[in-house]
Amino acid sequence: MILDEIIKKTREDIIKRESEFSLDWLGRSLAFNSRAPRDVFSYLSATPEDPYRVIAEVKKASPSRGVIRENFDPIAIAQSYEIGGASAISILTEPHFFQGNLDYLAQIRRYVSIPLLRKDFIVTKYQILEALVHGADFILLIAAALSKAELKELLGYTRHLGMEALVEVHDKSDLVKAIYAGSDIIGINHRNLQTFEMNMNLSYELIPLIPNGKIIVAESGIYEHGQLEDLSKAGVDAFLVGESLMREDDEEAALKKLKFGSN
């Protein structure tokens, strides 16, 4: 299964990185970092003035699609997203399967003012501290990659550092984990990370099971304004959109069209 392969490789990478820069060393480096993470909730909460909050993704490649963007300038893409009305920016940092890089996070942080999401396969506290040091305001935690206890522990550590987590679910059992852990931002990924099959009805199936007061994010398979309208009516607050924007030459125009429609 592809998710298992990615997690295995991720753990191998963490061992190498921690041998070079320990968790304690990373923690001490925060003394030189006075930046406070942004309040993600205020950026992702839908309002009548901005009902379609978009987390626009900086992503070069994926296991299912291969290279999505040959001419890849992460800083320019992120700046276009902010101008185009993104509420936050998701940055792929996984190097082997998505051709991401942790340095993209630090580079983009210097040029945009909206919240940044470290999107990776996070399974240790070390990666969470890395995210903060490199400029993230919130991180992705994938329920399918963690036990209930692990998810709760990592979410608690994330909040201890002043950040928040987007907890991604793919089915009812994942959702049970997310609720048990106390997740306040729940992402419903229409793509199954084990099989890469899409289920665009998943948001409609899971939203009724989510307690009130949570921010709900729809992920994957979102290409047009009508989907935002329909999902918003069902209870979605924000939308994580990557490939459909990354395939456009003008990301700013593509994002505006997605948010506001053709007119």
Swiss-Prot record:
PROSITE patterns for the chain: IGPS
Coiled-coil residues are: none
InterPro entries, A to Z: Aldolase_TIM, Indole-3-glycerol_P_synth, Indole-3-glycerol_P_synth_dom, Indole-3-GlycerolPSynthase_CS, RibuloseP-bd_barrel
Q: Specify the pathway.
A: Amino-acid biosynthesis; L-tryptophan biosynthesis; L-tryptophan from chorismate: step 4/5
- Which UniProt keywords are listed? Amino-acid biosynthesis, Aromatic amino acid biosynthesis, Decarboxylase, Lyase, Tryptophan biosynthesis
Q: Which SUPFAM superfamilies match?
A: Ribulose-phoshate binding barrel
Instruction: Please provide the Gene Ontology terms (biological process) for this protein.
Output: L-tryptophan biosynthetic process
Q: Which Gene3D superfamilies match?
A: Aldolase class I
Top enzyme class: lyase
Q: Report the superkingdom from the record.
A: Bacteria
Q: Which CDD domains match?
A: IGPS
State the HAMAP family in the record. Answer: IGPS_A, IGPS_B
Family to which the UniProt record says this protein belongs: Belongs to the TrpC family.
Protein name per Swiss-Prot or TrEMBL: Indole-3-glycerol phosphate synthase
Q: Which organism is it from?
A: Sulfurimonas denitrificans (strain ATCC 33889 / DSM 1251) (Thiomicrospira denitrificans (strain ATCC 33889 / DSM 1251))
Q: What is the lineage of its organism?
A: Bacteria, Pseudomonadati, Campylobacterota, Epsilonproteobacteria, Campylobacterales
